[in-house]
């Protein structure tokens, strides 16, 4: 895909942090950036699909564990994507002067997926370029208010963060009743 396109940004919408070592993930995304001529992006989240974790033999952990891991991972990944050599002696991850050479061609944007107002949106305000919300349209204003509050508390300009919404669409040849459409 990187070879066949020249404009499209490339990356997973949101990968569960729990599946990969964060330093290796940073190097993987950097490789994608290099082979695509600077078009990589990183979408990441705490991980949510317990059945998939079980099927892959990956520890799912508690809600708290997954968010602790995500924050530690961001403290490793972001500096590596910015051509720095981070060290971290965390509860879940340890790196020492983690190397990421060759460096990315571009400044790789980082998107955090999820809609948790206390943890996820704080991490977005602190670390991310984009927030990919996973909520109903009626919840978006409240989520944006929560994100703005985190940004204000952290001294970050909310307008620096792009917001996208992951939602469902039902495409069909015939009209459905509202109830049928909800089942899509």
Q: Where are the model-predicted features located?
A:
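Active-site-adjacent structural elements that line small-molecule/cofactor binding pockets in enzymes
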Residues: 1-184
């Amino acid at each position: 895909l990187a070879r066949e396109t020249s404009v499209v940004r490339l990356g997973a919408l949101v990968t569960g942090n729990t599946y990969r070592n964060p330093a290796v993930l940073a190097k993987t995304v950097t490789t994608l950036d290099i082979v695509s001529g600077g078009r990589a992006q990183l979408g990441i989240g705490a991980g949510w699909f317990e059945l998939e974790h079980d099927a892959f033999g990956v520890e799912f952990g508690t809600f708290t564990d997954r968010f602790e891991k995500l924050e530690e991972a961001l403290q490793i990944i972001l500096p590596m994507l910015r051509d720095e050599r981070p060290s971290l002696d965390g509860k879940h991850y340890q790196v020492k002067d983690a190397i990421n050479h060759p460096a990315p061609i571009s400044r790789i944007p980082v998107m955090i997926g999820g809609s948790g107002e206390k943890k996820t949106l704080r991490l977005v305000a602190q670390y991310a370029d984009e927030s990919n919300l996973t909520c109903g349209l009626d919840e978006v204003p409240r989520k944006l208010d929560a994100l703005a509050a985190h940004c204000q508390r952290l001294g970050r300009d909310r307008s620096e963060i792009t917001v996208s919404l992951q939602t469902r669409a039902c495409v069909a040849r015939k009209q459905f009743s509202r109830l049928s459409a909800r089942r899509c």
